[in-house]
A protein has these predicted regions:
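C-terminal cap of metal-dependent C-N hydrolases
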Residues: 8, 352-409, 413
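Active-site gating loops and adjacent loop-to-helix segments of metal-dependent hydrolytic enzymes
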Residues: 72-106, 218, 222-248, 268-273, ...
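Alpha-helical scaffold segments that flank or form the walls of functional sites
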Residues: 76-129, 133-151, 173-180, 413-421
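Metal-coordinating catalytic core of metallo-dependent amide/deamination hydrolases
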Residues: 134-257
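C-terminal helical cap
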Residues: 110-117, 273, 278-283, 321-372
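Short acidic/histidine-rich active-site segments
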Residues: 215-221, 275-279, 284-286, 295-314, ...
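N-terminal metal-binding scaffold of metallo-dependent hydrolase/deaminase domains
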Residues: 1-44, 55-56
Length: 423
């Protein structure tokens, strides 16, 4: 089965060359796409034709670091005490909330996050999950929900020592079971300051067993570095490097805000990935990271939202403060870097047949030379008209296809009320 996008204006994601043509999109995890100006006028009845006259078509987006478990936090009751530092943000807000999550809350969080991702043109999610007292099967719950929406994914559970030995062991077991089932993902760890040497070593061994990487928050707050120096006599990145995390090409280091020169060198000379989460860092008042000297940087949202256009624009606008400035092209390339990471996993989704159809009427000329400028200054999630994931139309003219948006939102509201009553 194929999908034909007639009269589409294809924007090459590397050269930004615009070509008006018909695009043939094949369905399935291994399906492809091809520009075919001579596609037949009459298509087989099982095929679908979309008129894309005046529309831009380009690869859809991926999120390099999400927290689906936070989806029901919007508008939740305030913390019992106003946090004054990053550790208190974790203690009074996120750790207080994630301990209350159960299966239905996790499922609702994944469905509503999938809904918002899809409508924002995001067809692939790399997620970092936490639900310490409803841990067993939680990753499969998220995976099935994202599958229903039609999104590709790489999932992990953020294992830590913060809730005791039993929960730590359950986190390792959940990760091993999920990856052994054939699902693709990472071995997740929370952060150095909640991970002892035993857990760190076992996580690296588990990642090697499953030929994947470790996904961990790194020096998001200065407290992570202070704890590591006090407890282990070294920096966070040095500790991770000594344990083998940086040797794994599919490892993801989240945030990387507070790094010294040696740590930057360790990351630069490693094959691992760094993910930037600008808006979350601003929200938590932890500072701004500098990323322009790292060879592999992708963008995430850290659970703040599911809009990768917005994340790219945030990284661009803040670069003058954090990195001495960045070109629109560099910001766009950072947005697109996630695709290379996804390909390294050979995971379903994230291929050539993941596309976004944009309704963008510009008051000024849009050219091959200025496309990144338009993207950084003028594009908006409202321009996302339709979305194709693995060759299947999952958003059709602004509406989720195959699922009832109202049902998803009602379910999320129901579970949010249950969660909030426990806080």
């Amino acid at each position: 089965m194929s999908l034909y996008l007639r009269n589409a204006t294809w924007i090459d994601p590397e050269t930004f060359k615009a070509t008006t043509t018909t695009i043939k999109v094949e369905e399935g995890p291994s399906g492809g796409m091809a520009l075919d100006a001579h596609a037949p006028v009459e298509c087989p009845p099982e095929d679908t034709v979309l008129d894309c006259t005046g529309r831009l078509v380009t690869p859809s987006f991926g999120c390099g670091h999400h927290h689906i478990y936070s989806a029901l936090a919007r508008g939740m009751p305030p913390a019992p005490k106003t946090p004054t530092n990053f550790l208190e943000v974790l203690e009074y807000v996120w750790w207080r909330m994630d301990k209350k999550l159960d299966h239905d809350m996790i499922e609702a969080s994944a469905l509503v996050t999938g809904l918002y991702c899809a409508k924002n043109g995001v067809t692939f999610v790399i997620d970092h999950h936490a639900s310490p007292f409803h841990l067993d099967g939680s990753l499969e719950t998220i995976a099935k929900a994202l599958d229903r929406v039609g999104l590709g994914h790489l999932l992990c559970y953020e294992i830590s020592c913060r809730d005791g030995e039993e929960i730590k062991e359950k986190g390792l077991d959940e990760t091993d079971a999920f990856l052994s089932s054939g699902r693709k993902g990472h071995v997740g760890l929370h952060a150095s300051f909640t991970v002892d040497d035993d857990l760190l070593g076992r996580a690296v061994d588990l990642a090697r067993k499953h030929k994947t990487g470790v996904h961990i928050h790194v020096a998001e707050g200065i407290e992570d570095q202070e704890h590591c120096a006090r407890t282990y006599g070294k920096s966070v990145v040095r500790r991770l490097s000594d344990a083998g995390v940086l040797d794994l090409p599919l490892s993801i280091l989240g945030h990387c805000v507070h790094l010294d020169a040696e740590e930057r060198d360790l990351i630069r000379t490693s094959p691992c990935w760094v993910v930037q989460n600008t808006e979350s860092n601003l929200n938590n008042n932890v500072g701004l990271g500098r990323y322009n000297d790292f060879p592999r940087v992708m963008l995430g949202t850290d659970g703040m939202h599911s809009d990768m256009i917005r994340s790219a624009q945030s990284s661009y606008f803040i670069a003058g403060l954090a990195e001495g400035g960045m070109s629109p092209l560099a910001a766009y390339q950072r947005l697109r870097a996630v695709h290379a990471h996804i390909q390294g996993h050979n995971a379903p989704g994230g291929g050539a047949n993941d596309l976004v159809i944009l309704n963008y009427d510009s008051p000024t000329p849009l050219t091959q030379d200025n496309f990144p400028g338009h993207f950084c200054y003028a594009f908006d999630a409202r321009n996302v008209e339709s979305v194709i994931s693995q060759g299947r139309l999952i958003v059709d003219h602004g509406r989720l296809a195959g699922m009832d948006e109202a049902d998803i939102l009602a379910y999320a509201n129901e579970q949010a009320r249950r969660l909030w009553a426990l806080l």
